[in-house]
């Protein structure tokens, strides 16, 4: 019976990861505001941050990496898909560890914690892409790309904190956690 419960828990995590990857891809490709620098602002990072809050590091990283890399492919930026996979996966892992380490039961502190985790994840994003562009295009090319990434980061932090607050008040995190981990608690 324990293996069935563990398998169900793993299946639910896999399903939530797949749904998260699809939402990340959709939010990245549909909700776009083009920037003059050639990049664009989107809601994808918000869902990466939420995936990092709800899923384990491995499942959150896979959802973030796959969803974002697919979005790059669909939008015609396939050359960036591998680095996007790595950067976005690291973002989700960053969010997971910050939210789990500093987790408290009071809502205002949870929201502040989510804002800190979001900001840290976006620092990972800006730094990751800067490093990549520095290797490929040199310092000038990397510097030219930073502005768009910072705008994306600021937007993502603000939007993800608003979405996180809504999900916290509506108990959606508790609901998702109960579904994903309900059998795991009894299986241990």
Residue ranges, per PLM feature:
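Loop-helix junctions at membrane interfaces
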Residues: 1-188
């Amino acid at each position: 019976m324990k293996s069935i419960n563990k398998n169900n828990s793993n299946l639910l995590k896999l399903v939530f990861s797949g749904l998260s990857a699809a939402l990340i891809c959709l939010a990245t490709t549909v909700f776009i505001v083009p920037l003059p620098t050639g990049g664009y602002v989107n809601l994808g990072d918000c869902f990466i941050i939420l995936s990092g809050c709800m899923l384990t590091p491995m499942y959150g990283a896979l959802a973030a990496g796959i969803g974002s890399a697919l979005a790059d492919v669909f939008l015609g930026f396939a050359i960036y898909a591998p680095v996007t996979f790595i950067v976005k996966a690291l973002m989700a892992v960053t969010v997971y560890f910050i939210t789990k380490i500093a987790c408290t039961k009071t809502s205002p502190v949870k929201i502040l914690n989510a804002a800190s985790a979001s900001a840290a994840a976006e620092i990972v994003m800006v730094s990751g892409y800067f490093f990549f562009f520095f290797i490929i295009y040199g310092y000038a090319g990397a510097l030219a790309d930073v502005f768009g990434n910072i705008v994306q980061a600021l937007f993502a932090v603000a939007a993800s904190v608003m979405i996180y607050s809504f999900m916290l008040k509506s108990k959606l995190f508790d609901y998702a956690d109960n579904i994903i981990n309900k059998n795991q608690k009894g299986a241990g």
